[in-house]
């Protein structure tokens, strides 16, 4: 008789955002007259930029003619996109990354979950706490997390690096040396970031201890401060210890289009084995490439028109972040984030738990956010709001929160 992967049975409950959706749907059904404003899941609301739409239309037209039709994409992605990524996101910033070290995919979420497949099962992982749930859950699925403690909401074989107000929501080096370190800056969910010097410290730590860093840079486009690195490869030595994940979802609004990429330098090795070669083998076996029309849309992100339009769009969301941050601060909340990231991290009032505040916000302000405890034990007593709504709804949400 067949057997299942019983690691899936170890996962506690449903995925965080699925749980939120169920609670919101139940409330909506019971209160159909209520207008609910959603500042929870990090989905964008602004339409695709005109330069991207033009590129999509052109690519669709190409697909309608035999002479310009495209089928399966190359394993790594089309050269036109990889060259644009290498130049604009890396080489123009002084980072030594070549086009053939870039793997185009349908998004950073898939890559962040799949990258663990090329590592041995007994590798020890370290994650920031609070953390984007995908990093932990996919390692649970792979049998790498150990056993779950319901009391502490932690896994026995996962090293948690607390990110609290005391350390400005930036992790300290773990006393127990891990094999794989997950870092995300600007950070989801706290909206915090670290300086380039701090990031250099992590690169040095990884190289010294034989670790690999999986660096999620999905929110890089929102960086506004000069002392924050836009890529880990700005740091000396990163080519021998770091994998970087990037997304077109938040910088270009591709949440409904799907495009991302992973960078694995050829200098990154385990003994004599290139991780680049392992990921290439995995990629070629399990993936047939992002669609041609989507990759052409990705190329338009790097056009002069695309850059200008997307800078304006990022500014729109960051203005929302300012509205949320200032509004909550004026209302007496303790808030952080919102400077280099589209997330605002707030302390729940009156010693409420994260889920108690979720219910309070939903029922009394008709606003949906994300409970901090859903991101890990250090998130308890905190709450995340996103700046990805439209401006009018964002202003209204803050006014409704102030009236609670």
Which role fits each region the language model picked out?
Residues 295, 299, 314-325, 335-347, ...:
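Conserved glycine-rich beta-strand-loop-beta hairpin in the small C-terminal domain of fold type I
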Residues 151-153, 234-315, 322-326:
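Conserved core segment of the aminotransferase class I/II
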Residues 123, 208-212, 239-240:
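A short helix->loop->beta-strand "cap" motif at the edges of active sites that frequently abuts
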């Amino acid at each position: 008789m067949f057997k299942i992967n019983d690691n899936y049975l170890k996962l506690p409950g449903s995925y965080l955002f699925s749980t939120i959706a169920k609670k919101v749907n139940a409330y909506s059904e019971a209160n159909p007259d209520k207008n609910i404003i959603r500042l929870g899941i990090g989905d964008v609301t602004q339409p695709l930029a005109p330069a991207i739409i033009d590129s999509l239309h052109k690519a669709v037209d190409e697909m309608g003619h035999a002479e310009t039709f495209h089928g399966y994409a190359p394993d790594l992605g089309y050269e036109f996109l990889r060259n644009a990524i290498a130049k604009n996101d890396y080489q123009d910033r002084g980072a030594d990354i070549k086009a053939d070290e870039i793997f185009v995919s349908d998004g950073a979420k898939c890559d962040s979950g799949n990258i663990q497949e090329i590592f041995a099962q007994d590798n020890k992982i370290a994650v920031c706490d609070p953390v984007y749930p995908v990093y932990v859950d996919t390692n649970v699925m792979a049998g790498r997390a150990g056993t779950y403690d319901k009391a502490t909401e932690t896994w026995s074989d996962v090293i948690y690096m607390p990110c609290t107000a005391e350390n400005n929501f930036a992790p300290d080096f773990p006393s127990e040396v891990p094999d794989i370190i997950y870092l995300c800056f600007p950070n989801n969910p706290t909206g915090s970031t670290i300086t380039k010097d701090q990031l250099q410290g992590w690169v040095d730590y990884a190289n010294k201890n034989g670790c690999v860093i999986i660096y999620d840079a999905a929110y890089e486009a929102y960086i506004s401060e000069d002392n924050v690195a836009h890529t880990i490869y700005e740091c000396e030595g990163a080519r021998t210890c770091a994998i970087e994940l990037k997304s077109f979802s938040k910088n270009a609004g591709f949440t409904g289009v799907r495009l991302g990429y992973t960078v694995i330098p050829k200098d990154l090795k385990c003994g004599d084995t290139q991780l680049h070669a392992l990921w290439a083998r995995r990629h070629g076996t399990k993936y047939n490439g992002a669609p041609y029309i989507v990759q052409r849309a990705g190329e338009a992100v790097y056009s002069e028109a695309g850059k200008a339009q997307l800078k304006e769009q990022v500014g729109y969301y960051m203005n929302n972040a300012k509205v949320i941050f200032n509004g909550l601060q004026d209302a007496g909340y303790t808030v952080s984030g919102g400077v280099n990231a589209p997330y605002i991290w707030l302390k729940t009032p009156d010693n409420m738990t994260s889920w108690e505040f979720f219910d309070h916000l939903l029922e009394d302000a008709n606003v949906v956010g994300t409970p901090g405890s859903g991101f890990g034990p250090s998130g308890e007593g905190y709450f995340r709001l996103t700046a990805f709504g439209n401006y009018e709804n964002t202003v209204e949400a803050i006014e409704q929160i102030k009236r609670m």
